[in-house]
Amino acid sequence: MSSELLRKIEQKYLPKKEYPDFRVGYTVRVYYKIKEGDKERIQPFEGVVIRIRGSGAGKTFTVRRESFGVGIERTFPYYSPNIEKIEVVKIGKVRRAKLYYLRELKGKEAERKIKEIKQWEYEAMQRRKEEARKQREEEQKQAQEQAQEQEQNA
């Protein structure tokens, strides 16, 4: 009951973010606003998405990159107002939901564990997702119309 209520509230009040669809294994560039004193600048952070957790307002994702031989991980709240935009740089296919094992791998070894997907494969995946989303919306709309008809008949 309460989780259903929370979901409805989140749907109503969460901002609609127009980020590209990305998954674990994708290489993304996150443009994050940083405030230093009275100045504000945008800092890009590029790396592999190693984790996506949660849903709704608490959804976060973790991006890992290696800089001068040192691994850097940064966790971003998905609905943060400080995220300016997210770009998908490279599409990778992995067989795990969490890529924590990349922490032990260095350089090329980590890259070899992620299979690169061709652009046409990615576009086909996006089309299938969009079709499924439209079909779900149609079904929900029909269910609402049926519920309204039943209320009117009652």
UniProtKB/Swiss-Prot annotation:
Biased amino acid composition, Low complexity: 143-154
Gene Ontology annotations for the cellular component aspect, listed alphabetically: cytosolic large ribosomal subunit
Residue ranges with Basic and acidic residues bias: 128-142
Protein name: Large ribosomal subunit protein bL19
Source species of the chain: Aquifex aeolicus (strain VF5)
Record keywords, A-Z: Ribonucleoprotein, Ribosomal protein
GO molecular function: structural constituent of ribosome
Entry similarity comment: Belongs to the bacterial ribosomal protein bL19 family.
Chain intervals for the UniProt region annotation (Disordered): 128-154
PANTHER family given in the database record: LARGE RIBOSOMAL SUBUNIT PROTEIN BL19M, RIBOSOMAL PROTEIN L19
HAMAP family: Ribosomal_bL19 (MF_00402)
SUPFAM superfamilies in UniProt: Translation proteins SH3-like domain
Protein's job: This protein is located at the 30S-50S ribosomal subunit interface and may play a role in the structure and function of the aminoacyl-tRNA binding site.
GO BP of this protein: translation
